[in-house]
Amino acid sequence: MNQTKNCVIVLSGGPDSTVVAYWAKKQGYDINCLSFKYGQIAEKETQQAALIAEKLGAPIKIIDMSSLREIFKGVTSLCDRNISLTSQFSAPIVVPFRNAIFLSVAVSYAVGIGATRIFYGAHGSDAANYPDCRPDFYKSLEETAWLGTEKTIQIQAPFCGISKAELLTVGANLGVPFELTWSCYLDGEKHCGKCESCVNRKAAFKEAGIQDPTQYA
């Protein structure tokens, strides 16, 4: 295996990280996927991530950190059913420092398998509301990883400069199976169609002019 083309993908099961995974494969990377159970209500995230990894022919490790629910309870509606979900962005949607947690684990994994790149699905539409989706965040974390491992590992969000709709267009051109991806904050058989993530998903497909294959309740 060529270590310079060996990468780790933080794969949530959503469309953004799935596009990144397909893009990395197209770039010739050997992709190794990580998905996380962090106490989220939407347990289908990791289920769909496993299906997507299988479709890609890539290995996946699902890391069970469900006990994080104990610190996210009362903080975020993604982990606590007693906090109402909203159809627009609101502070309780944010899972504090989530990407830092996931990317830190990804660094450890990358060291173990000799990967030199870590990719995750942050994009331009995220930057306004999510500090851990901004370039200054992941570049700072990259520097911390160098200091903490003495390994040259790059942390990148390849599509941080474009919108979610533009990202979906990239994915459509790559043949991403969007029907396998999961965005909803709930755990129903279908996307609820009403939570902020479902609303953003619908809007992005519409803006991109791509048929939305999602089944909504």
PLM regions and their residue ranges:
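ATP-dependent adenylation/nucleotidyltransferase module used to activate substrates
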Residues: M1-G175
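Local cysteine-cluster metal-coordination motifs and their immediate loop/turn environment
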Residues: S104, W182-A203
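Glycine-rich nucleotide phosphate-binding loop and flanking beta-alpha elements
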Residues: D126, F205-K206
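Short, intrinsically disordered, charge-biased short linear motifs at domain edges
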Residues: V170-N173, F178-D187
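Short cysteine/histidine-rich metal-coordination sites, predominantly Zn2+-binding motifs
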Residues: D187-G188, A208-A217
